[in-house]
Amino acid sequence: MIEAVFPQAREWGALFTSVSKIVDEISVSFKKEGVSARAMDNAHLSMVDFYIPKNAFETYTVIEEANLGIKLDDLNSVLKRATKNDKLRLSFDPSENSLVLAFISQIKREFVVNLIELGSNTPPMPNLSYEVTAIADPTALKEAVKDVGVVSDFATFEAEPNALYIKSKSSRGSVSLEFTKESGYLLDYQVKSDKKKIRASYGIKYLEYITSVDEAVSVSISFSNSAPLKLEYQIPGDIKLSFLLAPRADDE
């Protein structure tokens, strides 16, 4: 039996809309310490991972831990109906193959989402160390990716001691965007290397997917030479949402 009340229903909508850019269905784990999920896209280019601790909920009761297979189109259709002041109540009874979602404000609206059977194998999180870590404004990152998409199908992240660049070039032209702490777009910036430049390139389509996160207050950007990109978003309600994206195979 699972019963939980989350204070901001729309934050759940933002979370699962972002997850659905990478996967169509996911197994969500309800454990005594919180809610989590991790999945990889079909092309094995990107991984999504999120965690919501139990103390983020107004009430949280898990008598029996469970992994719930959810079709994201079905869940998002419901979560899109949340309004600004709605709380979200979640309930699951093992005898029923469904998740009950109720929006609670002046009136109570209750929806039932049927669950699906999914394998219980969760992909392991790679143990990666990064030479560059930056805390950035999420909207600025999203707009930078859109700017790069105007001229190219990939973006190169390049770190210098005092600035992070996102750039690209193609037969259509070139683009370069500079992020610094002085500009206000970087809240923190660390380069743990004495190399002159650290760079890696990533496909623009996936970058557009993993930077279109609504409601986030900050994003941590981590990368190394020709290594997977890690984006970790902090969403209100103590929700942590992370993406890993493989570098381009022909990255130089």
Predicted regions and their residues:
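Phosphate/anion-contacting hairpin/loop surfaces
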Residues: 155
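DNA polymerase sliding clamps and clamp-related checkpoint/processivity subunits
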Residues: 1-20, 25-150, 158-252
